[in-house]
């Protein structure tokens, strides 16, 4: 839920203390150590409301979010990477730790169903902005959810990719901006990015 947390915080019309609270990571040696309060909040809200889409709607009310934060899918998936040397790395957090060049990423299970409200938002968009964010562990995984990449490619909206200003260690070492765009197109299709 880290990407969702960051989107909620970015669009929230709340006190700076609330932003600091949502980004706070617990320290020490307890079971909470390393976990972010915001991720735990979203996980708890998901359990209370029954699904992540409703959890985001309710969290948006709590945080006075301006705009909408929509999940690509309600399903829990694992992100795997096929490296250029053919090895497979399972799990998002392990991918940058492999220190190998990524060939492709994929979701497991492969056929995660898209949330209809997300598909509707793509269909009705005037502009679609991808990024910034970790190319292989944040931007591209959303495009792999069944129907999302295709909906973006078919959209008449202008499609803009905003590249990170810094290299994502273990993911995009040595990448140029055009290599970022090529990776997106290789995963989602040639019409996924206009600019």
Stretches with model-predicted labels:
Residues 1-100:
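Electropositive, gly/pro-rich neighborhoods at or near active sites that engage anionic ligands
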Residues 75-134:
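Active-site gating loop/helix substructures
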Residues 123-124, 154, 192:
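Alpha-helix C-terminal capping/helix-to-coil transition sites in glycosyltransferase folds
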Residues 135-146:
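Glycine/threonine-rich flexible loop motifs
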Residues 135-137, 166-169:
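Short, catalytically relevant binding-site loops at active-site mouths
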Residues 155-159:
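A short helix->loop->beta-strand "cap" motif at the edges of active sites that frequently abuts
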Residues 162-164:
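Generic beta-sheet signal
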Residues 174-195:
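C-terminal functional extensions of proteins
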């Amino acid at each position: 839920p880290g990407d969702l947390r960051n989107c909620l915080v970015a669009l929230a019309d709340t006190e700076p203390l609330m932003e600091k609270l949502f980004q706070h990571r617990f320290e020490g040696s307890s079971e909470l150590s390393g976990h972010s309060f915001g991720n735990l909040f979203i996980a708890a809200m998901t359990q209370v409301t029954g699904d992540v889409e409703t959890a985001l709607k309710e969290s948006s009310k709590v945080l006075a979010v301006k705009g909408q934060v929509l999940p690509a899918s309600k399903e829990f998936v694992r992100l795997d990477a096929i490296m250029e040397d053919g090895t497979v790395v399972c799990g998002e957090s392990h991918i940058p730790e492999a220190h190998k060049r990524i060939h492709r990423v994929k979701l497991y299970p492969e056929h995660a169903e898209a949330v209809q409200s997300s598909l509707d938002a793509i269909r009705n968009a005037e502009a679609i902005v991808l990024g910034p964010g970790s190319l292989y562990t944040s931007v591209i995984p959303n495009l792999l959810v069944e129907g999302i990449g295709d909906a973006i490619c078919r959209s008449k909206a202008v499609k803009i990719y905003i590249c990170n200003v810094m290299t994502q260690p273990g993911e995009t070492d040595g990448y140029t901006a055009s290599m970022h765009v090529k990776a997106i197109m290789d995963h989602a299709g040639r019409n996924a990015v206009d600019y």
